[in-house]
């Protein structure tokens, strides 16, 4: 399956008032990250893989709903100029509630606050994520 790569074109900022429900995970929070993976039906991540991700500059955030880690996204620092909003995932029973948008926006703001070019990608048949990407203000790179 082909992917579509998007680049962010700054068009202003949308303010949301829920920053306390989304936060970055520290390197010491692998257990919490693995809890989210299990809720998504994925295998837990080994400790050495988690630390390697952080060493390479990948940082995860989680969106909590009533204390449950229901959505995640990360920033992948591919270069000194461009960072990517990546690995956006929402627990199936919590989808279609705006959580993918909110967790992606959290990462996007971090990237822009650091003066980097923001990118994001998704599968060409993932129409739900394409709508999120469009709402965030990204345009496809053709």
Language model region names:
Residues 95, 104-112, 134:
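A conserved short alpha-helix in the GNAT/GCN5 acetyltransferase fold that borders
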Residues 111-123:
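Conserved GNAT acetyl-CoA-binding A-motif
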Residues 101, 124-141:
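Conserved active-site alpha-helix within GNAT-family acetyltransferase domains
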Residues 48-91:
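A conserved beta-strand-loop-helix scaffold within acyl/acetyltransferase catalytic domains
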Residues 87, 91-102, 125-127:
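Conserved glycine-rich acetyl-CoA-binding loop
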Residues 31, 35-45:
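Helix-loop element at the rim of GNAT/NAT acetyltransferase active sites that forms part
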Residues 1-20:
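Acyl-donor-binding surface of acyltransferase catalytic domains
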Residues 21-33:
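A short beta-loop-alpha structural element at the N-terminal edge
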């Amino acid at each position: 399956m082909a992917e579509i790569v998007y680049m962010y074109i700054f068009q202003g900022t949308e303010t949301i008032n829920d920053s306390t429900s989304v936060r970055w995970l520290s390197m010491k929070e692998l257990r919490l990250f693995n809890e989210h993976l299990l809720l998504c039906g994925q295998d837990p991540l080994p400790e050495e893989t988690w630390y390697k991700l952080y060493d390479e500059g990948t940082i995860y955030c989680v969106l909590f709903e009533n204390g449950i880690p229901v959505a995640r996204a990360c920033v992948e620092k591919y270069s000194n100029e461009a960072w990517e909003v990546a690995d956006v995932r929402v627990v199936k029973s919590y989808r279609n509630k705006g959580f993918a948008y909110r967790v992606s926006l959290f990462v996007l703001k971090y990237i822009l606050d650091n003066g980097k070019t923001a990118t994001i990608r998704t599968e060409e048949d993932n129409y739900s994520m394409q709508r999120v990407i469009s709402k965030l203000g990204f345009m496809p790179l053709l």
